[in-house]
Structure formats: structure tokens, C-alpha cells
A protein has these predicted regions:
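Conserved "HGTGT" condensation-loop signature of ketosynthase/thiolase-family condensing enzymes
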Residues: 1-241, 245-438
Length: 438
């Protein structure tokens, strides 16, 4: 058996999958330190969705979705095709669906390829890139992807979790020549990626996030990826409710040489059935929401009154939306009386459509963009399981980067930076062009 085959065999045995029901939530596990609750720094993130223009950076795409930025004033494409590019809608495919003929598995494979292949060239060409194996003279500058731990949330019942995890692992091994004896200068460790799959619905990403934080606590000298993907409208092609999200996280003391984009604490949930009803008590669902929000804020070292914005998944068009929205809105209004829920909240599926297993981390990614530029703490709320609401809190970095509305955004005109991750600004580089990060 050759080396690559050996790696593939051993890695296959390591793929694990946890199944949660379609609206499952995480079981929170926390080991608080004397200094406060455990939190991870967001080193970088990537988001793929057909609404994105390839020549604008990930950072801009998230802010565009939140209606916080516009295309550059000199954008010739907007000028020539305003009906297509001046409003948020699908503008291109991430994965080619062949008119709906592509299988769900094949569609998933294409998303993985688009995400991972984008890192290949810069990984081997730039010693300053966060993940790299560039310099042959000084391998101390390397940060290899060998052995990367990945927590990945996928839709229940639509994919084989073992096959999906194996495919992601093998794409990473092959793309970065991990353990490939034909390219001995491309790696120093042959450890395959460690992929853990969570199968579920809209809240599955919260489970993956909690598992990632558990891993970082146990492995403070490593980084971790948290991912989710779904395309709920398949076999329709190019729908804006398709989302692949990759969060790149590190522990609080990990030296990234970059400013964090944001900080994340553990998600928190509460079961409605655990609360009593009575004429002198609020409805049990409101009690559960109050407990979940308070715990999520505590897990992020915050008070509920620190929340300045809410991102949630209670689609206004869904038949069950009035209940979840009402319960969440009442809780936020009572816990954060200075926050206007109507004006200071974002209903993602009302804009993008129901997002399935892609919901939780897409909302977290939007929250990261908001806190990084606006500076207000964001509550990300999962409303789809009315028996067990869940929430997590996204905390701004120490230095907020205000949007500069009169300045242009970086554009990958030659697409050399298309679909690359958004990173925190390096400490040794001045923040020049909005949207440029390596």
C-alpha cells in the first residue's frame, strides 16, 4: 500500500458523524477559567453564495447582504447592467448544477472544491498567508493544513456523512499534497485532516461550533475550522439560500499575528419543558428564551444589555414565524429595553429563503461582519426548534474597523483573490484598501 493510500485508509476510519434531529440544538459544555468564560478568536472566514460577485471580497459580500455597503462608485458593471448588479440577487453559480441534473452529492462536491482549491496557489506562494507551506529556507514560517480539525454541519437525510467527510478530507490532502512522497517539500507532517460531521437542520451549525470550542480548549496550540453547507432548493440551480460557511477559529492565546475579526463564546439553549407555567409567570417559551439569551451572553462575557443587534432565522413568510418572532422579540425587548427589535434585527431567511443546515453559521458570519465594522455585540438566535431555543453571542474585536463609505473596496479584477477568505488585518501591515486581507 502506498503512502497516500495508507493516509486515506487511516483517515477514513477517523471520520465520525453525529446525528441530530432536523431542529436539534447543541448540548453546551463549558469549562470556565478564572479569567472568564472560554472564547475563541475568529481568525478568518469564508462564505460562498450565488449572490456574490467574484470581484468583490468576502468582507464586502457579508456587508452587502446586511445592506451596509454598496458597490464602488466607479463600478462599470453596475453602470452597464444595473438591473442585475444594483440589488441583492443571484448573479452567478458557485456550483454548476447542469439545469438541475447534478446530484445533491455532486453539487456538494463542487462547493467543497470551490472553497478548498482557492487556497492552493497562495498556500504555496506566500509565507505571510495564514496557512502556508511556502519557504523552503525557513519552515518556521509554515502553518500547515496537515491534521486540521474540521467540524462540519450538513443536512440530515440528504448526504452520506462518511462519504461527505471523506471527500472533504481527500480534497484537502490532494490539494495541498499532504504526505505525497512525490512532493516532499510540500509538507513536514503527513497527518490527514480530522473531519467530524454533524447531520441536522437549521441549528446543526451551533452543535459544530460548540464541538469546535471544545476542541480548541483541549488543543490550545491548534486552529479549527467550523463549516456548514446546504442547498435546500435543489434541484433548482443558483439559489441564494445555498450557503457554505467556513469559520477559522483559534484559542484566546493563540498567536495569529493578526487582529481577530470577532470573538465567539459557546452557544446556549434552554428547553421549554424545563420551565413551569402559571398565571403569575410568563409563557414557558419566553422563560426558555430568557434563559438561553442570558446564558449565551454570559458565555461571551457580556450582559444581555450589551446586545446591540440581533440576527435570527424566523422567516416572516413561514407559517410558524409569528410564534418564534414574537417570543424572541418579547425577550429581547425585556432584556435589552434600549434595543428597537424592528430596526435593530436582521431576518436572514426573509431575505435569502430557508437555508436548512446552512442557517446557523451563515448568521454567525453575518454577525462577525457586523461586529467587526459597527462595533456592537450581536445576538444570533436560532428559532426553528420552538421546544428548545438557542442563541450565541458575537463580540466585537478590541479595535473596530468603521466602514469608510467614501472609499472604494478592493476588487479582484483578475480573480486572483476571488473566493478567498476574509482575514483579520496583520499587525505588521497597515490597513489600506477596504476589503483587502491576506
Amino acid at each position: 500500500m502506498n503512502a497516500c493510500a495508507t493516509f486515506a485508509f487511516s483517515a477514513t476510519m477517523a471520520i465520525t458523524a453525529r446525528h441530530v434531529n432536523a431542529e436539534a440544538t447543541t448540548v453546551v459544555k463549558r469549562n470556565p477559567t478564572p479569567a472568564g468564560p472560554y472564547m475563541a478568536q475568529v481568525v478568518g472566514l469564508q462564505w460562498l453564495n450565488p449572490l456574490q460577485r467574484r470581484d468583490y471580497p468576502t468582507e464586502w459580500q457579508l456587508l452587502w447582504t446586511l445592506e451596509l455597503v454598496k458597490p464602488n462608485k466607479d463600478d462599470d458593471i453596475v453602470r452597464t447592467k444595473p438591473e442585475k448588479y444594483s440589488k441583492l440577487q443571484a448573479v452567478g453559480s458557485i456550483a454548476v448544477g447542469n439545469g438541475g441534473k447534478e446530484t445533491f452529492k455532486g453539487y456538494h462536491h463542487k462547493y467543497i472544491e470551490e472553497l478548498i482549491y482557492a487556497y492552493h496557489d497562495i498556500y504555496f506562494m506566500d509565507s505571510n498567508y495564514f496557512y502556508n507551506a511556502h519557504s523552503r529556507d525557513d519552515r518556521l514560517t509554515w502553518r500547515e493544513l496537515a491534521g486540521i480539525h474540521i467540524e462540519y454541519a450538513l443536512p440530515e437525510g440528504k448526504l452520506d456523512p462518511v462519504e461527505a467527510g471523506n471527500y472533504l478530507r481527500d480534497i484537502i490532502i490532494n490539494t495541498f499534497s499532504i504526505g505525497n512522497e512525490s512532493f516532499p517539500n510540500a509538507w513536514t507532517r503527513s497527518t490527514p485532516p480530522d473531519v467530524r460531521i454533524t447531520m441536522g437542520g437549521a441549528n446543526a451549525g451551533f452543535t459544530s461550533l460548540s464541538a469546535a470550542l471544545d476542541y480548541l480548549q483541549a488543543h490550545p496550540n491548534e486552529t479549527v475550522w467550523v463549516m456548514n453547507w446546504d442547498a435546500p432548493s435543489r434541484p433548482k440551480d443558483r439559489q441564494i439560500n445555498e450557503n457554505m460557511v467556513q469559520l477559522i477559529l483559534a484559542g484566546p492565546n493563540y498567536k495569529t499575528e493578526r487582529a481577530p475579526l470577532a470573538w465567539l463564546g459557546y452557544p446556549a439553549s434552554a428547553k421549554v419543558a424545563d420551565f413551569d407555567s402559571g398565571k403569575d409567570k410568563p409563557p414557558r417559551v419566553n422563560q426558555a428564551w430568557k434563559a438561553a439569551v442570558e446564558k449565551a451572553a454570559h458565555n461571551a462575557g457580556k450582559q444581555t444589555t450589551d446586545v446591540g443587534y440581533v440576527i435570527h432565522d424566523a422567516n416572516n413568510n413561514a407559517s410558524t414565524a409569528p410564534g418564534p418572532i414574537a417570543a424572541l422579540a418579547r425577550t429581547v425587548t425585556e432584556e435589552v429595553p434600549e434595543l428597537d427589535f424592528v430596526k435593530q434585527s436582521f431576518n436572514t431567511p426573509a431575505l435569502l429563503g430557508e437555508m436548512g443546515a446552512g442557517t446557523a453559521l451563515t448568521n454567525v458570519a453575518l454577525g462577525i461582519a457586523y461586529v467587526n465594522h459597527i462595533g456592537k455585540t450581536v445576538l444570533v438566535a436560532g428559532t426553528t426548534n420552538q421546544a428548545q431555543p438557542i442563541a450565541t453571542v458575537v463580540v466585537p474585536p478590541a479595535v473596530v474597523r468603521p466602514i469608510r463609505p467614501d472609499e472604494p473596496w478592493f476588487r479582484a479584477r483578475g480573480e486572483n483573490a476571488a473566493h478567498l477568505a476574509w482575514w483579520g488585518i496583520r499587525h505588521d501591515v497597515k490597513d489600506k484598501t477596504q476589503g483587502y486581507s491576506r
